[in-house]
């Protein structure tokens, strides 16, 4: 049994309406059965597969004090285009011909998993598709999602985030070999720190009476006794849980933390964050959800783009969540602290879980409320992509109405968002005008919907979500209680997530409801609206600097100064826009450094820097280079040319004199994305060149006799005497660098400094650039006469070009 405090006064819940009273759009959005407080749903797979399929529901009691378990019947199903493909199995399934003319015209339902998989295998044989999934079937892969779709139930109804029992944990590992490796027997887990949202904390650690195997058994016992609904951690999938599972295997300890006493199931998975895809080992725990705050921070940064990195400490400081007098220890010092400052390290570990709790509480709200709508569990809602979320809503409603499903179109989208740069240089003041919900507004006002959406769900759900969000935002303004306001904010954010996902469905190649022509129509219309906005800003005396998909950065007219005037000017642009399109004020900045398209820096009135794009500052660059560029940008924004020159000279002198804070200042750290054997095979086949990271990993393995595996991180620096050395032949592990006898390649790092400095070439004349970024100071440097350049850029779009408009 797990205990928790009763729910606090909650905000109005649109999902709580009885199905008989709910509108069609609400039933489609929230499901037909408002069963409350479902925490998790798990298929029962431990019996014979020929028996009737069932699921186990984990449900909080009315007072939230305990978990109630009960099993329910479940009927595995799929949609099929041709029912005759199942000829010969007629006594093993039930089917229904669906309404409409869509491709998947029949619903097929089974009583057992044996019958279900036999039917799929027969279709594979009859369609010659054993090598790939047959096009004749539309299958919902997750049994849990199938159950939630057919029952019309969703998780977490009538609950708030804190009604869930959320447990945070973090491990610390002792290693003498750089980054911990669970395959090395000596790389032991030394500390496991816990906290939860009930005010409880606990530290487990090695001591004279506790070896690692005992520590692992204690960890299992603590999790089972606390019985949380959610396990939260930072990078918990790729490190903490995976490492514990590996160490449990080493010591023959069952990591049996499932609510049914099972060991977690692991499998390879991936998540996409804008242009970046992250592979990770997913971990499923029966009856519980795993939430990784590392992924939450990455999701946040897709839109903010101003986090320097995704570490727990950085994120906690960014959001103002770090505990007062927080203990900080660098990762490389963990083992030393265990030997020399054990109490300090224990304080550090406890601060880690406290930060994780605060971070998860801050970032989990929208996902929590998404789970109240989607036929997905809380953990799945946190990890599934936007198109999958929308499609799950559509399939649930098509299933409820017994309507055939469309087949995804072949093809691709040809139009994208409108991005352009008109002026590079340093300008200010800056206003950001945002076309509010540009693509959703276009889709609503221009009757956009996929051709296969026979039920018109696309416009119905989009309109209902938009209305719900506006109503919730108004409730937020009216609410006096801060807790209620916070809950409402999370709820409106969940609506926003779904609203912004509709466009992605149109252009997603694997979506059953895709429509590339409609996706292109939305993008093309968006481009035209932004061009109208640009023209209107210019007509009213503003200077447009850049346009980026759904907003415009501009210098307001001379007579418009101060926040109130800037807001009035920006919002007033709406009157020139097409019906249903609103222009909003989305920020003001003291100055802007415009570099190239989709790459710029903004200086807030509080003195903070915000960056867009990776051309200026890339996380793959050496830390000293990132620091140099960041400081140089600030000096440019301040028009401090002398300070910029001094920064260059100072950084150069530090490189020449090996005046580094540590090897981390100039070392690169890269992750092994392949095994060493796969790397060698690719090199031998001529599929890739040799790389410093892998060559050093091989050296490390040979030197220590300890295995290096995929996912390990290698930190290294460049050696040698000339700037043009071959990296894999002239590199050493960062741990080998000796500050008393430095052997880094000074010429190479001076070249890297000059490469960073070249980013600023567009802001000066050629002669001035050579003066500013020159080490020659014999006669002293003077910034007199040096002007920061502004350059106009020819637009990708010309006002007089003849272009077909689709409306």
PLM regions and their residue ranges:
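C-terminal, non-catalytic extensions of nucleic-acid polymerases
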Residues: 564-807
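Catalytic palm active-site di-aspartate
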Residues: 469, 541-556
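Short active-site loop/helix that positions an aromatic residue
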Residues: 240-249, 436-450
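Common nucleic-acid-contacting/processivity interface regions adjacent to the catalytic cores
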Residues: 2-21, 332-437, 441-446, 484-528, ...
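Conserved RNase H-like, two-metal-ion catalytic cores of nucleic-acid enzymes
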Residues: 18-88, 143, 151-232
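Active-site-proximal helix-loop-helix substrate-binding element of RNase H-like nuclease domains
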Residues: 202-206, 227, 231, 241, ...
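Catalytic palm subdomain of template-directed nucleic-acid polymerases
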Residues: 552-568
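Active-site cores of enzymes that catalyze phosphoryl transfer or operate on phosphate-rich substrates
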Residues: 155-200, 462-513
């Amino acid at each position: 049994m797990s205990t928790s405090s009763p729910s606090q006064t909650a905000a109005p819940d649109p999902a709580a309406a009885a199905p008989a009273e709910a509108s069609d759009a609400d039933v489609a959005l929230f499901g037909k059965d408002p069963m409350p407080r479902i925490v998790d749903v798990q298929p029962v797979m431990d019996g014979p597969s020929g028996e009737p399929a069932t699921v186990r529901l984990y449900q909080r009691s009315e007072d939230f004090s305990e978990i109630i378990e009960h099993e329910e019947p479940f009927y595995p199903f799929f949609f099929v285009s041709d029912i005759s493909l199942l000829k010969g199995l007629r006594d093993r399934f039930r089917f229904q011909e669906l309404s409409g003319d869509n491709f998947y015209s029949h619903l097929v339902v089974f009583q057992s998993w044996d019958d279900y998989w036999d039917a799929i295998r027969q279709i594979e044989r009859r369609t010659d598709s054993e090598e790939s999934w047959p096009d004749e079937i539309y299958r919902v892969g997750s049994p849990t999602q199938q159950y939630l779709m057919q029952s019309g139930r969703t998780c977490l109804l009538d609950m708030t985030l804190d009604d869930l029992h959320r447990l945070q944990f973090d491990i610390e590992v002792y290693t003498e070999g750089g980054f911990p490796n669970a395959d090395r027997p000596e790389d032991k887990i030394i500390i496991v720190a816990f906290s939860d949202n009930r005010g409880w904390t606990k530290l487990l650690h090695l001591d004279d009476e506790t070896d690692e195997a005992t520590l692992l058994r204690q960890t299992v016992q603590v999790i089972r006794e606390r019985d949380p609904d959610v396990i939260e951690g930072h990078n918990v999938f790729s490190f903490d849980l995976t490492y514990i599972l590996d160490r449990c295997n080493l010591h023959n300890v069952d990591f049996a933390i499932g609510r049914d006493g099972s060991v977690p199931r692991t499998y390879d998975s991936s998540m996409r964050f804008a242009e970046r895809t992250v592979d990770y080992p997913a971990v499923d725990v029966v009856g519980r959800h795993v939430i990784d705050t590392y992924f939450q921070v990455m999701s946040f940064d897709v839109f903010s783009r101003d986090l320097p990195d995704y570490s727990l400490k950085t994120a906690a400081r960014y959001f103002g969540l770090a505990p007062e007098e927080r203990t900080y220890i660098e990762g490389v010092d963990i083992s030393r602290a265990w030997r020399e400052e054990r109490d300090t390290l224990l304080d550090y570990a406890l601060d880690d879980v406290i930060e994780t709790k605060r971070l998860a509480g801050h970032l989990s709200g929208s996902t929590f409320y998404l789970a109240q709508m989607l036929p997905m569990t809380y953990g799945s809602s946190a990890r599934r992509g936007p198109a999958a979320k929308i499609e799950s809503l559509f399939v649930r409603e098509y299933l409820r109405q017994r309507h055939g499903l469309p087949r995804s179109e072949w093809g691709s989208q040809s139009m994208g968002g409108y991005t352009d740069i008109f002026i590079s240089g340093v300008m200010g003041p800056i206003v950001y005008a945002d076309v509010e919900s540009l693509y959703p507004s276009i889709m609503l006002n221009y009757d956009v919907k996929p051709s296969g959406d026979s039920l018109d769900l696309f416009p119905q759900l989009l309109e209902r979500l938009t209305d719900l969000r506006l109503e919730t935002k108004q409730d937020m303004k009216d609410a006096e209680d801060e807790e209620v306001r916070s809950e409402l904010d999370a709820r409106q954010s969940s609506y926003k997530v779904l609203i912004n996902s509709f466009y992605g469905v149109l252009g997603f190649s694997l979506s059953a409801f895709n429509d590339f022509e409609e996706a292109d129509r939305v993008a093309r219309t968006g481009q035209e609206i932004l061009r109208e906005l640009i023209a209107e800003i210019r007509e009213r005396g503003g200077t447009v600097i850049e346009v980026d998909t759904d907003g415009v950065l501009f210098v307001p007219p001379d007579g418009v100064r101060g926040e109130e005037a800037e807001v009035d000017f920006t919002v007033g642009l709406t009157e020139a826009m097409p019906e249903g399109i609103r222009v909003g004020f989305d920020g003001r900045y003291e100055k802007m450094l415009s570099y190239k398209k989709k790459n710029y820096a903004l200086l807030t009135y509080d003195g903070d820097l915000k960056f867009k794009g990776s051309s200026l500052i890339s996380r793959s660059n050496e830390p000293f280079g990132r620091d140099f560029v960041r400081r140089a940008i600030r000096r440019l924004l301040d028009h401090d040319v002398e300070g910029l020159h001094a920064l260059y000279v100072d950084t150069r002198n530090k490189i020449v004199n090996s005046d580094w804070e540590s090897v981390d200042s100039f070392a690169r750290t890269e992750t092994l994305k392949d095994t060493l054997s796969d790397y060698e095979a690719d090199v031998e086949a001529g599929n890739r060149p040799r790389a410093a990271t892998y060559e050093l990993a091989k050296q490390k393995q040979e030197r220590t006799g300890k295995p290096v595996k995929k996912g390990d991180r290698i930190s290294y620096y460049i050696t040698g005497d000339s700037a043009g050395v071959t990296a894999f032949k002239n590199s050493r592990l960062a741990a080998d660098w000796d500050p008393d006898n430095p052997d880094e390649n000074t010429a190479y790092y001076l070249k890297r400094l000059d490469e960073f400095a070249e980013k600023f070439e567009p802001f000066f004349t050629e002669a001035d650039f050579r003066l500013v970024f020159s080490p020659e100071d014999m006669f002293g440097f003077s910034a007199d006469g040096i002007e920061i350049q502004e350059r106009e850029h020819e637009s990708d779009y010309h006002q007089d070009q003849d272009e077909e408009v689709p409306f």
